[in-house]
Amino acid sequence: MSSFHATTIFAVQHKGKSAMAGDGQVTFGQAVVMKHTAKKVRRLFGGKVLAGFAGSVADAFTLFEKFETKLEEYGGNLKRAAVELAKEWRSDKMLRQLEAMLIVMNKDSILLVSGTGEVIEPDDGILAIGSGGNYALSAGRALKTHAGDHLTARDIAKAALETAGEICVYTNDQITLEELE
């Protein structure tokens, strides 16, 4: 049975601000675009946390709910909530079946959370996941390195997603962009 997947999520911290962008394409199997305007980036915990997913849509919704519960349980402590989610995701027989990855961020931290138990904080304040993730990551790193005062975190996130959308067939130009200050 085919699943709904394929996307690009990009997140960056730059000059004291954080931005996350995701495209809107949902692909069924390897050949059919089912939706162009999906929202894969969300605000959680009263708007103080951004979360984006790549992978199975149904699995991602389950993980969003679990992560938000962990945020509430740990008083908004992003790192603790991410570690506890990763531990549960890896150890729970049912959750282990979920096929998705998350990027979560607040104004201070950005983390990749995976079902294999990884919680990774990048050295450079940039993360990207999904089918177009490597394209977005490359574009974002170049832009951040050479941006100086000319580009904001929002500008970098938007341009990185646009670049990925021009290259990756599973990424489109219907971008959802959220920013934290």
Curated annotation (Swiss-Prot):
Cysteines engaged in disulfide bonds, as pairs: none
GO cellular component: HslUV protease complex; proteasome core complex
Keywords associated with the record: Cytoplasm, Hydrolase, Metal-binding, Protease, Serine protease, Sodium
GO BP: any one term: proteolysis involved in protein catabolic process
InterPro entries (UniProt xref): ATP-dep_Prtase_HsIV_su (IPR022281), Ntn_hydrolases_N (IPR029055), Proteasome_sua/b (IPR001353), Proteasome_suB-type (IPR023333)
Gene Ontology MF terms: metal ion binding; serine-type peptidase activity; threonine-type endopeptidase activity
Domain of life: Bacteria
Binding-site positions, Na(+): G165, C168, T171
Enzymatic class: hydrolase
Transmembrane spans: none
Subcellular location: Cytoplasm
Pfam families (alphabetical): Proteasome (PF00227)
Annotated active site: S2
UniProt EC number: 3.4.21.-
Family note: Belongs to the peptidase T1B family. HslV subfamily.
Functional note: Protease subunit of a proteasome-like degradation complex.
HAMAP family (UniProt xref): HslV
Quaternary data: A double ring-shaped homohexamer of ClpQ is capped on each side by a ring-shaped ClpY homohexamer. The assembly of the ClpQ/ClpY complex is dependent on binding of ATP.
Protein name: ATP-dependent protease subunit ClpQ
Organism from which the protein derives: Bacillus pumilus (strain SAFR-032)
